[in-house]
Amino acid sequence: MTKSLLSLAVTAFILGGCSLIPDYQAPEAPVAAQWPQGPAYSPTQSADVAAAEQGWRQFFHDPALQQLIQTSLVNNRDLRVAALNLDAYRAQYRIQRADLFPAVSATGSGSRQRVPANMSQTGESGITSQYSATLGVSAYELDLFGRVRSLTEQALETYLSSEQARRSTQIALVASVANAYYTWQADQALFKLTEETLKTYEESYNLTRRSNEVGVASALDVSQARTAVEGARVKYSQYQRLVAQDVNSLTVLLGTGIPADLAKPLELDADQLAEVPAGLPSDILQRRPDIQEAEHLLKAANANIGAARAAFFPSISLTANAGSLSPDMGHLFSGGQGTWLFQPQINLPIFNAGSLKASLDYSKIQKDINVAKYEKTIQTAFQEVSDGLAARKTFEEQLQAQRDLVQANQDYYRLAERRYRIGIDSNLTFLDAQRNLFSAQQALIGDRLSQLTSEVNLYKALGGGWYEQTGQANQQASVETPKG
């Protein structure tokens, strides 16, 4: 009987080679072969290390930011959920993969029963006993048309997509922490600037008020000076609030409070980031985890079509066991007590009111939906990189122009202050110079923040943020298929 069971298993594996999964072909990328060109774009440069392979410790120069990113990778809850989802999909794949193999189980049972005389065939009451021990396979499906293999393939692709989703979550987290940190730094700089400007306005207001008391300045001059003071106080409260909210945002991203031993930050206008190469549009197909995730989900939908097709064909399941049966426990394994069971079952769909056809149509529609999602993901990635490349050059020019504007306003302010104090110009000219300088300085900080966040977003768009150190891509093995 053991040989019969073995032969049955071998036959099942041979017959299980058929698959109805459609041949998979990746859709054409619906984007241009080159990045956009024009006055807003810098010429793309090649590099030995792609942006996706550049470690975030080499990309971000600020030691405080590096410390915060490391903290977030340990404590962030979104990243923890993504890792747990990966474990869950791995377990689901292993569960589905187990259906490819017969589930062998051993069973032992025993019973004793008293039969009354009026129910006994002999007319006498008695006690009957029965003991059994069997080893067998229960309801094993012969995968003749690849239904189980299709479902296993679908579970595998879903698991692989969850691995890419975890990568996307980490890349997004690294960029989010960096952007939140730079926003915090910029708001602190704006708060400090406003604090200093408010003191200057208050000094000017007090000076104008004293001048009014001796008849030098008019009531209008006093009112204008007070307006500047109150406007600065509004900004002071605004930036004070923003700094506190920035800390709260960082705390959520970190999953814990900002470390008390946080390293000394770099100045906002220091060399904060390494420049990353754009490469070619085709590179992001292999390096963006969200694109890889979308393709794995497309492959999973393609595998589901195979399972839906297989449902049209007969399914055969086998139940078989062998063992011993005896009325006496002591003779259960004695010669002549052997027993066996072989019970095949076939299920042939005849009428189902069109549900199988509807299931197949649904699986094909789901594949078409995933094709559209895959193409949309590629288009979004292309746009994000293109936007980042346009921002790189234009922000450099804009920032330099804004620095020149600040310098011009500083010169204007010094001249206006000198002329006001010696009585050549009115207080109105001096206040105008103060406001212009304050506005230009605020804009400079805002432009620097926009430039930094744009570069961070470009690094993210190119797939950067997964590796801690440059060179890890060559050391880290690709994701392995989990074993059953």
UniProtKB/Swiss-Prot annotation:
It comes from the Bacteria. A lipid is attached at residue 18 (N-palmitoyl cysteine). It is a lipid-anchor. GO terms for cellular component: cell outer membrane. Its main location: membrane. It is found in: Cell outer membrane. GO terms for biological process: response to antibiotic. Keywords: Antibiotic resistance, Cell outer membrane, Lipoprotein, Membrane, Palmitate, Signal, Transmembrane, Transmembrane beta strand, Transport. InterPro entries: OMF (IPR050737), OMP_efflux (IPR003423), RND_efflux_OM_lipoprot_NodT (IPR010131). The keyword ATP-binding does not apply. Induction: The arpABC operon was not seen to be induced by carbenicillin, chloramphenicol, erythromycin nor by hexane, toluene or p-xylene. Transmembrane segments: none annotated. Residues 1-17 form the signal peptide. GO terms for molecular function: efflux transmembrane transporter activity. A lipid is attached at residue 18 (S-diacylglycerol cysteine). The outer membrane component of an antibiotic efflux pump. Confers resistance to numerous structurally unrelated antibiotics such as carbenicillin, chloramphenicol, erythromycin, novobiocin, streptomycin and tetracycline. Is not involved in organic solvent efflux. Belongs to the outer membrane factor (OMF) (TC 1.B.17) family. This is Antibiotic efflux pump outer membrane protein ArpC. It comes from Pseudomonas putida.
